[in-house]
C-alpha cells in the first residue's frame, strides 16, 4: 500500500509541479493522478523513476511505496 500523504509531502517539498514530476518520471500527468487516487498501482519502473525524480533515499522510497 502506498503512503499517499508522505508521497504528496515529498512532491510538495521538491518544489516541482505535478506535471513536471510526471514528465521527469516518464509518465503522463493523468497516469500519475490515477495512481495517486488509488485507481491503479504503481509499476516498479514508475517507483524507480519517481524515486529518482524526487531524490528519495531507499528508506524514503520503501516508507512511501511499500507501507503496510
Task: Map each language-model feature to its residues.
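A short, Lys/Arg-rich alpha-helix, primarily the initiator
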Residues: 1-17
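Residues in the recognition helix of alpha-helical DNA-binding motifs
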Residues: 10, 24, 35, 64
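The alpha-helix within a helix-turn-helix
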Residues: 11, 22, 51
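A structural preference for long, well-packed, hydrophobic secondary-structure segments
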Residues: 13, 34-35, 56
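Short alpha-helical DNA-recognition segment
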Residues: 16-34
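DNA major-groove recognition helix of helix-turn-helix/homeodomain DNA-binding modules
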Residues: 45-60
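Short amphipathic recognition helices of helix-turn-helix/homeodomain-type DNA-binding modules
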Residues: 61-68
Amino acid at each position: 500500500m502506498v503512503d499517499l500523504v508522505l508521497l504528496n509531502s515529498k512532491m510538495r517539498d521538491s518544489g516541482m509541479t505535478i506535471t513536471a514530476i510526471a514528465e521527469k518520471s516518464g509518465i503522463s500527468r493523468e497516469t500519475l493522478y490515477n495512481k495517486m487516487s488509488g485507481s491503479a498501482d504503481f509499476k516498479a519502473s514508475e517507483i524507480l523513476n519517481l524515486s529518482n525524480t524526487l531524490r528519495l533515499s531507499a528508506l524514503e522510497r520503501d516508507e512511501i511505496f511499500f507501507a503496510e
